[in-house]
Amino acid sequence: MRIPNPTLKDIAAEVGVSISTVSRALADHPAIPQKTKQRVLKAAQKLNYRPNAQARALRNSKTNTIGLVIPNLFNPYFAELAAAVQNAAIDAGLYTLLGISNDDPKGLIQAVEIMQHQRVDGIIAVPHIGTEKELTALAKQNVPLVLVDRELDIVPATSVSTDPAEGIKAAVSMLVTGGHESIGYLAGPQDTSTGVDRLEAFRSACGSFGIDQYPMLLGGYVEEQGYVGTQELLKLGVSAIIAGDSMMTVGALRACHEHRLTPGFDIALVGFDDFPVFQLQNPPLTIINQHVSTMGAKAFEELHKLLRGDSAQHKIKLPTTLIVRGSTPPKDSASDSPGQGGH
């Protein structure tokens, strides 16, 4: 009859050795003979023994758990980021405790406090303006900390984010070369480093092509802001739109659909982040790709270095690339659609 929750004592009784011998055998202690270790492991497997992670953490002062704080899970970008971090952690034999900040400074601070109470070994967080003081204090307590996706320059911690300049410049270049003179931009929130950096990259790209007038709408990283912003840009008569975020891209698609405009025929549209839903559009959407899975894996790699004693701080910027598909034809060919809004 199988014991419901076997303990070290049960294994010791099964093998006929002391509890301390079982404990050291499971820890692969060099003083325990290999034959005894094999007997203990066989008994543990037979009894379906599972070590108590909390008890082991109290002994070792480590929980083998990292914390990950992201704004939300409904944005596929953050869902993919979380999956990448967790998969990398699993490969390293670590657990991941997930916290949701709801893109609110108080939510981020609360999530970090909970993780500290749970004694996580280190934290990866998507930061928010208004949390500089708390994150700086965390870093100064020598808590291994990596900021991902966004930066807070005054926080003394490693950060992993993307440089939007290359991808956005390639998008503007493609549109200008294709004859688009009125390019609208859906800008993200200016209280995030990503929103600021992407807007600056767009302005710089336009300037490099001699464009000093460009329609632009500021909004949040939510579908509704992309929807409303696209409606306003369409009123201004733009022939092309670049969305500064994945959720804003979804909103832009919804607005185009309601106006019976098909990206690739009636208007050129460049989205952000390469998610399957954008590839399934007809025609598929041209995308500025951040390679989010690579970013998540890199963030964990940097945290893992800190957990192993590397105290060096790094500011890592990963490149963005443009994936050209059917939603951004030259201006003249876009006007040759088989019928306004006929798709």
What are these regions (language model features)?
Residues 1-3, 46, 87-92, 140-147, ...:
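Bacterial carbohydrate/catabolite-sensing allosteric modules
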Residues 1-64, 329, 343:
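N-terminal helix-turn-helix DNA-binding module of bacterial transcription factors
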Residues 2, 46-52, 106, 126-128, ...:
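Short gly/ser/thr-rich secondary-structure transition/capping motifs
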Residues 8, 40, 85, 111, ...:
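Aromatic/hydrophobic pocket-lining residues that form π-stacking "cages" and hydrophobic walls in ligand
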Residues 14, 19-24, 58-74, 174, ...:
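Short beta-strand segments enriched in small/hydrophobic residues
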Residues 38, 47-114, 118-122, 200-203:
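Amphipathic helical "hinge" segments at domain boundaries
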Residues 55, 109-112, 135, 172, ...:
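Short hydrophobic/charged patches on amphipathic alpha-helices used for structural packing
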Residues 130-139:
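Active-site-adjacent beta->alpha loops and helix N-cap segments on the catalytic face
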